[in-house]
Amino acid sequence: MFVPILAYLLDRLPFGNSLQGISRRQLSNLMLQNNAPSWHEYAIINRKWRRHACTACRWLNAVLPKNSSIFEPGCGSGANLLWLGQQGFQRLYGSDISVGALELGQNLASLLSLPLEVWHDDGLNPAHVPTELDGILSVNWLYHIPGASLGAFLARYRCALKIGGYLACDMVTRHYDRVPGNTWHTKDKNLPEEKRRPSEYTLRLDEPEIRCVACRNGFAVVKSTCFTFSRPQRAVYLLRRVE
């Protein structure tokens, strides 16, 4: 009984989730140098409260040996990979469509003396994916892409993982379907409907659906947790590639 309760609490407490070794001033200076989207500064400063990202990283940290290779499509500034680097991982790779975010990540890695290899690519239709990976991290992007499919994503990246390799991901749950105004962009809620953009949360799945999609694409769900009171409600999953 004690172990599940402890695991539940660790997934939700902010301790140990911050990126160490960089001040707000240093980060602001790097933001100016790289012309990275301002959202990345917020995400790095507030990383410890972004539980869906932190939990996925912590789970990979717990199950993978430190010599493992980890790839994050949609890595942005690489903050998640750099956190893993601060836990002792050395073979860290990422891709993103934002050149400014990638440059920020490279400069952060240099400042923190951490290994990081990143390149410009589309996570849904990648031109280059590493092979024989031990782990893949995918958080905070797939459900923002109109028309994205978790099944297609798993099918595409399964072959990049070793048999027995892990994939940690998050997903917005269908609870958000019941939130008033869920079809509209959250920043447009006070605008007239004709001026509102569609919701930024374009893909929403509950755990039974995740398990079904995972099974169909050669993965088993090892563990999951749902952040019930987050808005939007998100769940995190650790999948393992099976033969």
Q: Predicted segment positions?
A:
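A conserved beta-strand element that flanks and buttresses the S-adenosyl-L-methionine
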Residues: 137
